[in-house]
Each structure stands twice: as structure tokens, then as C-alpha cells.
Amino acid sequence: MFEAFIVAMASVWADSGFSALTSGNIIMICVGLVLLYMAIAKGFEPLLLSPIAFGCILANIPKNGFEQPGVMSVIMYGIHHEVFPPLIFLGVGAMTDFGPLIANPKTLLLGAAAQIGVFVSLMGAMALGFTVQEASAIGIIGGADGPTAIYLAAKMAPHLLGAIAVAAYSYMSLVPLIQPPVMKLFTTERERKIVMEQLRPVSKFEKVVFPIMCTIVISLLLPPVTALIGMLMLGNLFKEAGCLDRLSDTAQNALMNTVTIMLATGTGLTMSAEAFLNYQTILIICLGLVAFAAGTWGGVVFGKIMCMVDGGKTNPLIGSAGVSAVPMAARVSQIVGQKANPANFLLMHAMGPNVAGVIGTAVAAGTMLAMIGPVAK
């Protein structure tokens, strides 16, 4: 009987995850726990990092059976077949006010200038030995747009998706720490004190026409990005139409929350020890930081150029909001500007380049897809 008990226990042990647990699994479970701590205790993008971290822990449980058909395979399908990022964009569009951009269209140039971080990171990644597809997926981290980063990574470098997503969302949460030193380094105190004129009112007609025209023009120019831009602008049309409140509310709340859970958990599920624990992950994290700093620099420098051209009417600080971390980057512009001049209220001015950055990052992704093309699946 004792021998039968020993045999039974040995069988239980052999079937358990403990018997197949590797040092890599243990390290990645610890990474997941650290990310959970950062999200819950420190408030770093908790709505995104929490499910990513939990997905990371689940992915590193040996013999989890996730390769079998079931809910996890459905979630992974949504990640690898680019289902979730466009749905996230639908919710983002429903929550976005393009009024500041419509009122001051030249801020679209600031959103474009901030995309320099994407291409700086792309060239850096290629110099470090990444393929052009991998470098493109890494470069989009500089746009500070998690869904776009996941969308492009799934198409161009699915094996790097976990590292790219974690880098993108981690640095988005660190925008208040990364941007101010760059902003102060490349602006003078006099420039930071500039008070901008109040924006003009934007009519309902303009707000309704804007998403329709954006969809048509950008999609015709860059067909590969139609899914992202189309869903972003459809969500915004729900918001601005005035007769689609139920759809707008669903996109902003129920749908957005549901898809966020699926997208973030699925991203975490890609963070297996085999895929994550390599030198490429370290390079991606370093390149992501360079991309964020370069994007901030590009926006600020172009803001300085605009300031010189318009006779000192533009505060260069709003250029840093050209990265699409909405609305964190715009808030940072407001905080830095108000420290220099308590009478400064840059938030609405900064929202122009901030929402332009959302469009700019999607356009950058579409450009790379059109020029380079996705990897074969």
C-alpha cells in the first residue's frame, strides 16, 4: 500500500507544473510579479500592466494547456490576427476630442515631427542587427501608442510582441519622468513662459466632417492602416454625431474595458521565458527609451521653429505632446509650462499635437507596412 501511495505521488508530481518548472519560468513569474507591483502599488498604467503581468505569469506555468482550443486560444487569435488593436482604437476615438487640432491645424505638424522618434529607433535597431521588419516594429514604440505597437508587432515581428508591448506601455507610464528633462534642455526659460492665445470655438459641422475626411484621405493614401484609422474615426464620429450616444457610450466604456482586458492579457501570454529572456529584449527596452526621448526632442525642436516663424506665439513645450500618449503628454506640457509661468494654461493647446500624434503614429505604421510589408504567416 505504501508503494502504491509513492507511485501515486510520483504520478501527481510528474503531471504537475513543478516537475517542468525551469529557471526561465521562475524569472518570468518574478517579472510578472514586479509588473503587478508597479501597476498596483505605484500606479504605472494599472489598467494595462496588471493584465499584462498576470498573463505573463500564466504563460510561464508549465503544462498550462493553452495550446488547446479554448478561451486562451481565442485571446491569442485576437492578438496575432490584429483583432483587438482596431477595437481599442474605436474606444479611443469615442473618447477623443479633435477640437483643439481642428482649431489650430498647424499643430498637426508637431504630431508629425514627434514621429522622428519612430525612425531614429528604427535606424538604431537596424544598426544593432535587427531585420528591417523587426526594426520597424521596435521603432513604433517611439510613437507612445501601445495598440499601434501591438498591431505592427503582430504583423512584422510577432516573436517580439511581448517585449515591444511591455516597453511601449512601461514608457507611456513614465512619460512624466522621461519628457521634462528633454523639454527643459532644449527650451529657454523665456520660451517656456510664452502664453498662447485662446483657441477659437469649433463648430459641430467641423467635428463631424473631420473624422469622415480623415478616414477617406488617409486610407486612400495608406490602405494598410485603414483598420486603425477607420475604427479611430468611427469612434469619434459616434461621439460627435449627437444622435449616437448609446454607441459612443458602449465604445467608451463596456467595449473599451472588455477589449483592454483581452488585449493586455493576450500580450502577457506572449511573454514566455523562451520568447522574452534574450539579449533582444534588453536592446528593445533601451531602444524604446531612445525613441521616446527622440520623439519628445523632435516635437520640441519643431515647436521652437514654429515659435520663431509666428513671432513667438507658439510655446515650444506643446511640441513634446506630439507623442500619442493621450492625455499624459499634454498634461506634462501643462505642468512644465505652469512651473515656468503660473499664468500659463497649455493643456488645450497641447491636446492638438497630442491627438495629432495618435494619427501620426498610425500613419507611420501604415507607411512602414506599405514600404516594407508584413512578415509571411
Task: Briefly describe each language-model feature range.
Residues 77, 81-82, 89-95, 110-120, ...:
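Alpha-helical membrane segments and immediately flanking helix-loop junctions
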Residues 33, 101-122, 272-299, 350-354:
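Entry/N-cap segments of selected transmembrane alpha helices
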Residues 159-177, 285-295, 318-321:
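Alpha-helical transmembrane segments
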Residues 123-132, 164-192, 298-311, 356-377:
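Juxtamembrane and boundary regions of transmembrane helices in multi-pass small-molecule transporters
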Residues 215-302:
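Transmembrane helical segments that form the transport core of multi-pass membrane transport proteins
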